[in-house]
Amino acid sequence: MPFANRSRTESKAICRIDANHFMKTNEKNLKGKKVAILATDGFEEDELFSPLEALRQAQADVKIVSPGKDQIKAWKYTDWGRTVKVDVPLQKARPEDFDALVLPGGVINPDHLRREPAAVQFVKAFFQIGKPVAAICHGPQMLIEADVVRGRKLTSFASIKTDLKNAGAQWVDHEVVVDNGLVTSRSPGDLPAFNAKMVEEFAEGIHMQRPTALAA
């Protein structure tokens, strides 16, 4: 069944199955690791909640970071979906307090975040330090804005392929791509592979910094 045609109930079940599949196939443990999920209204529902559940099952301390709101609302297919509580306002979030970063997609979410200078700088700081980052679907739009994709191999939702190439990325059509601590995937259908690689890279911790990721 195509992912876009699944019901809300089926989608929630998929998130649970994805997390369970991850736990059976990946023994990495994130106990003691603190992970930020940067998002705002219009994030793709499964692309936040599925990684969130996988990270929590790996015993990570996960915080939702967002600008200016107590809670944010997902977009689900053609309408608004579930809400999630914001744990840390963007204005108070410090990259040095986190071990890794997740960037969910959704058409609305990254388009709003990329216009927030504090959000762009927050993302860039993870690359400057060499901390692992996972971005899915339209999430890599934030990587373009932060100017951290030049020379990197990655994937994304197909509609932003040209934008990523123009920003200097090597775009490939794979379900999950790992490049020196950066994990990317194309769509919600890739979540099982995305979650597994995300946790694996987050467990490894800081990666060697690249000069292209340190541009001002």
Where do the model's predicted regions map?
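N-terminal amphipathic/basic-hydrophobic helices that include classical n-h-c signal peptides
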Residues: 1-22
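Extended, subdomain-level signal for the structured scaffold at the beginning of enzyme domains
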Residues: 15-129, 133, 141-153, 161-216
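Catalytic nucleophile serine of serine hydrolases
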Residues: 137
